[in-house]
Structure formats: structure tokens, C-alpha cells
């Protein structure tokens, strides 16, 4: 009798496992690549540090510059990469008290943004900037929504003074556990939820984001490569779903501050998979 019960339990378990409802939430590579992949999909890593430009230039068509090594290096990186660029301007725009307080808008933010954009323009780098990024995870970092609205208006005011930025748009990555404040202002919208792995693609948060998109808005997917997540489901999903405009893996370089909690893609055994993913996108675009 015990053996019979065990067999019945095993049969039921297999049936549940194979059911579409369960399989939908199982981390796997079963998201198939579409027959007609996109030709305009963007692929590039969140932020940049160390020798990332030379290490990734052969398999990205998107560059994300966060100025982690200062303005001079940022300009050099953008010129060397010569790809569609997302430029983080938080260094010019925001300040905070201590290491835990909210970010507030600097009184002289406009002057600093214009001065930096002028340096980029004079160096011939500004023409590569297609998206401006006021600050990372604004729903988790900025003082309040009013502050973010002011920052967004300031970015557009500064950009209006440069012919290279005619038609420039905004990009954002939100924290997953809080409302997407000011989402309507951004053309490229993403959120990070690394614990969900590829299940994030069928999560309620993703469905809500997709349903809330306005005209001209697209989603960027953020696979957690630094945490061992396979890029394949994200690339396949991006190619199969019209609302996805970019895949922005986190994180190529090795963060030694301790905030990431793991090595980057370049060193954690995931490098080959992400290089192949990038080349699959760039070969088509």
C-alpha cells in the first residue's frame, strides 16, 4: 500500500510540474527565440567601470555611462564606445546628507548639467547620447515625486540648448517594490527584481508595467547576470514581445564596494553566455 501511494504521489507531482500553470513560473530556457527577431533591439550593460569599454565593445549596441570614474573618463568612454548612449546625470543634479538620506535637487543643478553637456559637445561625444537618465531608482532614492518632476523639467531645459540632443528621451530603472513615480516622463522604462530571476517576465509587476505604457514608451529588461541569471530567456522574450526595447544586464564589472554582493559578469562564470547573447542581438540590429 505504501508503495502504491508513493507511485500515485509521483504521478501527481509530474502532472503538476508539466502543467502550464506551474511551468510558467519555472526558471528555464523554454522561452523560444522567435522566427523573426527584432532589428532594433538594444543590448548593453548597466553602467561602466574599469576596462569595460574594451571588454564589451564587440557585443553591445547600447552604452550606459554613470560617471563612476568622473567626467573625463565618461567622455573618453562614450567616444571610444561610439554606441547609442544612456547618460546618467545624477552626479550633476542631486546631493544627499550622509549615506542614508534621500537625494535632493541641487540649487545649481541646471548650471552643472549644462556645463557637463557642453564638455561632451565640445569633445564630439554628445551626438551619441540618445537617452538621459536623471537618477537610478528614483522611487527609492529621490526625496519625493515633486523633486523628481523638477529634475525632469531641468534635464529637458538643459538639453534644449544643444542641437545634438534634439529629440533626446529619458530612461529609468525603478526599484520593483515601490510605485513607478513620474513614469509618464520616460521613454525607456525598466525595473529590477533579481530574486524573481526570469520569472519576472510573467510577474504581476511586469504585466502592470506593460499595461501602463503610453505612446512611444518601451520596456528595458534587467537580467541579473551578477547573480548568475541566464540571459537566454530575457533575450528570447525581448525578441518576441513588441513592448521591449532594450536588454540591460546587471552588472559587467566587479563591484568592490560590497553593495552588489557578488562579482560581475566578467568574473563570475557568466561572461561567455552574456557575450553570446549580445552578439546575437548585434548581429541582427
Where are these regions (language model features)?
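Feature marks short, highly hydrophobic, charge-poor N-terminal signal-anchor/signal peptide-like helices
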Residues: 1-5
Amino acid at each position: 500500500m505504501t508503495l502504491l501511494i508513493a507511485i500515485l504521489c509521483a504521478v501527481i507531482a509530474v502532472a503538476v510540474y508539466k502543467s502550464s500553470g506551474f511551468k510558467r513560473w519555472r526558471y528555464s530556457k523554454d522561452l523560444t527565440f522567435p522566427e523573426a527577431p527584432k532589428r532594433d533591439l538594444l543590448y548593453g550593460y548597466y553602467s561602466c567601470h574599469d576596462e569595460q569599454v574594451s571588454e564589451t565593445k564587440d557585443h553591445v549596441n547600447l552604452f550606459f555611462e554613470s560617471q563612476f570614474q568622473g567626467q573625463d573618463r565618461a567622455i573618453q568612454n562614450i567616444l571610444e564606445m561610439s554606441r547609442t548612449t544612456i547618460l546618467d546625470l545624477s552626479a550633476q543634479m542631486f546631493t544627499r546628507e550622509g549615506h542614508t538620506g534621500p537625494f535632493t535637487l541641487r540649487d545649481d543643478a541646471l548650471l552643472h548639467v549644462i556645463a557637463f553637456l557642453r564638455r561632451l559637445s565640445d569633445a564630439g561625444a554628445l551626438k551619441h547620447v540618445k537617452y538621459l537618465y536623471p537618477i537610478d531608482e528614483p522611487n527609492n532614492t529621490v526625496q519625493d515625486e515633486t523633486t523628481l518632476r523638477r529634475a525632469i523639467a531641468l534635464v529637458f531645459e538643459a538639453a534644449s540648448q544643444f542641437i545634438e540632443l534634439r529629440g533626446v528621451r529619458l530612461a529609468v530603472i525603478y526599484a520593483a517594490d515601490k510605485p513607478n513615480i513620474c513614469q509618464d516622463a520616460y521613454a525607456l522604462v525598466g525595473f529590477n527584481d533579481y530574486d524573481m530571476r526570469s520569472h519576472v517576465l510573467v510577474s504581476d509587476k511586469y504585466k502592470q508595467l506593460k499595461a501602463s505604457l503610453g505612446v512611444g514608451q518601451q520596456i528595458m529588461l534587467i537580467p541579473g547576470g551578477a547573480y548568475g541569471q541566464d540571459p537566454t530567456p530575457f533575450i528570447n522574450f525581448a525578441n518576441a514581445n513588441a513592448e521591449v526595447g532594450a536588454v540591460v544586464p546587471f552588472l559587467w564589472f566587479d563591484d568592490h564596494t560590497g553593495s552588489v554582493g557578488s562579482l560581475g559578469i566578467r568574473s563570475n562564470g557568466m561572461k561567455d553566455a552574456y557575450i553570446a547573447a549580445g552578439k546575437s542581438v548585434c548581429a541582427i540590429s
